[in-house]
Each structure stands twice: as C-alpha cells, then as structure tokens.
Amino acid sequence: VYTEPAFLTGPSAVEGRRTMHLGIDVFAPAGSAVFAPLDGHVVAAVNRNAHLDYGGGLVRAHSDDRGTPFYTLFGHLDPHSIAGMANGQAVTAGQQVASLGEAAVNGGWQPHLHFQMAYCLPDIIGTTVDDWPGAGDPDDLAFAAALYPNPAELLGLAPEPYLYPVVSAETL
C-alpha cells in the first residue's frame, strides 16, 4: 500500500517513501464502537475523504500528570459518527466517541482504527490540526519518533512487540 503516489515524498519511486507506520492499527468490522482511552477534549472532527486518507478523523487534546499537553488521533472512522463532535467538547475515558467506517467512507481502507499520538499539532502553512502523516520516511525515524511516540501504552499494550528489529546489512 505504501507504493501508492500518496506516500511518495522524494523525487523518485526508490527514495523518499513514507513506509514507516506511525500509529497502531486495530482491525474490527465497520460500525464497531470506538471508545476514548483517556479524558480529553476535541480539537478537530473532520472528514478527510481523499483516497488513502483518514476518512472520518478525530483529534483530541490531553495533558499528562505534569500538565504537559499531548494529542491523539483516531482515523478511518465513519464520518457520520463524529458529525456532532464540536471543538472544545469534553470527552471522558471510556466514552464512545465514534464508530469505524466502511472502505467507502474511511479513505478506502479495510475497516480499522488508526490510533496515533503526537506531542504537538501540525503548524505549517497550508496544514490544519488534523493533517497528521500516518506513515513516515524511515530516514526521518528519529524526528518522527520525537513527534509521534509509540501510543501502545495508551491502549494498554506493551510497546516492545510493535517495534521492528533493526536488520543488519549482512542479513539483507
């Protein structure tokens, strides 16, 4: 899937590919309920309906025990399930916030939740707060990891099984 033009960031098909997934995907049937893992408030509820985009997307703001802000993104939702969400709306842990969308409304993907965490919102001219890359270029791993940490623990998952091992040149 990362061979599609939407994931090309460089001048040719052999460089500059966004092939490193930056979130966790949880596969379930379309229509499955999506629940908030933590308290927070809505920053954006959008329909990014381009092919291979998020479809329905929900960005929420949170803060850790020290008051440091961070953000979470739910992608590939049914846009109708988040239509009533308003910016600033409080959401409590355990509350149903959306349902998964079918491929026809979720960017063309098999139904699943894309869950991602970020330490800051996009702030580049021409972007919006919901304009998160779901995949990054492996050459930018350190940068991507600093902005988009592994969200496994927020879902009650151990982070270790979700990190790919480094493959040596000899093995390749």
What are these regions (language model features)?
Residues V1-T19:
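Extended, compositionally biased flexible segments
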Residues V14-H51:
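Short, glycine/small-residue-enriched coil/turn segments at secondary-structure junctions
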Residues H21, H62, H76, H112-H114:
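Histidine-centered active-site/metal-ligand motif
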Residues I24, G56-L58, P111-L113:
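Short beta-strand micro-motifs in enzyme catalytic cores
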Residues F27-P29, L77-M85:
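Short alpha-helix capping/helix-loop boundary micro-motifs
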Residues P29, F35, A86-T92:
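Residue-level recognition of short, solvent-exposed, well-ordered loop/turn junctions
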Residues A36-S81:
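Zn2+-dependent peptidoglycan hydrolase active-site motif and core
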Residues A83, Q89-V105, W109-L172:
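Acidic, glycine-rich catalytic/binding loops that coordinate metals and/or anionic ligands
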